[in-house]
Design a protein with these regions (language model features):
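N-terminal Rossmann-like FAD-binding beta1-loop-alpha1 element of flavoenzymes
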Residues: 13-35, 163-169
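Dinucleotide-binding/catalytic capping subdomain of oxidoreductase cores
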Residues: 37-38, 163, 167-316, 393-403, ...
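N-terminal Rossmann-like dinucleotide/flavin-binding domain of flavoprotein oxidoreductases
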Residues: 38, 46-102, 251, 256-270, ...
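Feature captures the FAD/FMN-dependent oxidoreductase FAD-binding
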Residues: 69-124, 283-295
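Glycine-/small-residue-rich beta->alpha transition segments that form the dinucleotide
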Residues: 102, 106-113, 159-160, 322-335
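Glycine-rich dinucleotide-binding loop and its adjacent helix/turn
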Residues: 112-191, 348-357
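FAD-site-proximal beta/loop scaffold in flavoenzymes
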Residues: 124-142, 285, 290, 302-375
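C-terminal, flexible cofactor-proximal segment of oxidoreductases
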Residues: 354-486
Length: 486
């Protein structure tokens, strides 16, 4: 048999997930001129690009321009996209093992971390990711209903997602209507009764995880004042020492400078206001059948034995009336049947991207992880490029060492995922396309996605918008089929 990776015997790789980590992995794999690689990319949505489409704020179109790089990868010979295909529903992990030399799991962290406080499950208390998906037209969240009638909303968290949702609630209709915000969200946000958005940070200004541009934007809102009580900027000794040290992250130092400038501003009397609070943690959400208030505990900072600056409760309490609570305190992944998973950390266990058995720590040949499901929800979009290179280098090393597994015989019945094939079933000859067709999976090709894309852009043009997004899977499938029929 010709060498694996030759033109006669290309390396076959499946990538589960089509966000930045998945596309960077595909690009690193396919750009090697001395290696022949075929990549099949799977996503449970009909649309690719993951959080670039469904997570980046609609008023940040420049960030979304990275999609042009992914489009070049998708245009490479040997690349195929299988949208609207869910691993575990339409195809089992074992069936991917049978058809690919390597499977890269790049499906991100889909669930949010809980606050773990009383009242967290009251109507009106939501994960910030749910809110983000809702205004970004994610089809799973199109029918969500957010109560925006109360004058105050509270956002829990001090990272960029918290800044995004606070800013989106503060934007006026005229600005929303120049973006690709979902139509249903534009109407709800533009007509909301929210006048004040309070953003709570567990630790102090020096520990806030915002990037500098996100912080600056909060001070540039056309119809919302930015408010920080000067008392919030009274730093503890440990934070001052950190800011003055050579170890200080320049982002943290600049954030504190921006916060200090905000705290000196006099409110201009704009229609709304965004209030940043530090050393404040929610301890209870109250209400009779819905969110009516939130109890906030005051924290103090201390330096632990390892030199880390941590927060502890002082026992001081404050109650704020509100009608909406959005928590943005981190994310975790969910497991796939047949793939090792560390439920405590919410990650696929791995070493340098090689998936490992949870108990023994042994490498699982042919299985790899990349992105947030590999390392946790950290970094920006570009962080995934280096992360993907590390994982792909592990694949190359395994290929050169001869430890890449051969293609295995499929073990599942084409009619039903996860069931043993009947005796004598000729499942070896069933390609992934045939398998999906037998299951009735209505998969979307990259050509189909391009038709969806074109339809959205065309719909937005008369309104001066970059696109009007479909928010229903059946609408996406219909748009894709119109092109594939030509």
């Amino acid at each position: 048999m010709p060498a694996l990776g030759s033109a006669e015997n290309p390396l076959r790789v499946a990538i589960v997930g089509s966000g930045p980590a998945g596309f960077y992995s595909a690009e690193h794999l396919m750009k090697r001129e001395d290696l022949s690689v075929n990549v099949d990319m799977f996503d449970r949505l009909p649309t690719p690009f993951g959080l670039v489409r469904a997570g980046v704020a609609p008023d940040h179109p420049k960030i979304k321009s990275v999609i042009r790089m992914y489009e070049k990868t998708a245009a490479r010979d040997g690349f195929q996209f299988f949208g609207n295909v869910e691993v575990g529903r339409d195809v089992h992990a074992d069936e991917l093992d049978a058809r690919y030399h390597a499977v890269i799991y790049a499906y991100g962290t889909a669930t949010d971390r809980q606050l773990g406080i009383p009242g967290e499950d009251l109507p009106g208390s939501h994960a910030a990711t749910t809110f983000v998906n809702w205004y970004n037209a994610h089809p799973d969240f199109a029918d969500y209903d957010f109560d925006l009638s109360h004058r105050r909303a509270v956002v829990v968290g001090n990272g960029n997602v918290a800044a995004d949702v606070a800013r989106m609630v503060a934007l006026p209709r005229a600005e929303l209507e120049t973006t690709d915000t979902a139509d249903h969200a534009i109407e709800a946000l533009a007509s909301s009764g929210v006048e004040e958005i309070v953003v709570l940070g567990r630790r102090g200004p020096a520990q806030a995880a915002f990037t500098n541009p996100e912080v600056r934007e909060l001070g540039e809102l056309t119809e919302a004042d930015i408010v920080i009580d000067p008392a919030e900027m009274e730093l503890d000794d440990a934070s001052r020492a950190y800011l003055e040290s050579d170890d200080c992250d320049p982002t943290s130092r600049r954030n504190v400078e921006i916060f200090t400038e905000f705290s000196s501003r006099e409110p201009e009397g704009k229609r709304k206001r965004v209030v940043l609070r530090f050393c404040a943690s929610p301890v209870e959400i109250k209400g009779d059948g819905k969110v009516e208030s939130i109890v906030i505990g005051r924290n103090e900072l201390y330096e632990d034995g390892a030199g880390a600056i941590r927060a502890r409760d002082t026992g001081e309490r404050e109650e704020l009336e509100c009608g909406l609570v959005l928590r943005s305190i981190g994310y975790k992944g969910i497991g796939l049947d047949g793939v090792p998973f560390d439920s405590g950390r919410g990650l696929i266990p791995n070493e340098a991207g090689r998936v490992t058995e949870l108990e023994s720590g042994e490498h699982l040949p042919g299985h790899y992880a990349v992105g947030w499901i590999k390392r946790g929800p950290s970094g920006v979009i570009g962080t995934n490029k280096k992360d993907a290179l590390d994982t792909v280098n592990s694949i190359f090393a395994d290929l050169e060492a001869g430890t890449m597994p051969e293609l295995r015989e499929p073990s599942a019945n084409p009619e039903t995922p996860g069931r043993e094939a009947p005796d004598g079933a000729d499942t070896v000859s069933v390609t992934i396309e045939e398998l999906l067709a037998k299951r009735g999976a209505d998969h979307i090709t990259y050509l189909g996605w391009q038709a969806i894309d074109a339809a959205e852009v065309t719909a937005g043009e008369p309104h001066g918008r970059p696109r009007i997004k479909f928010c229903r899977i059946d609408e996406m499938v219909e748009a894709s089929r119109a092109a594939e029929a030509v």
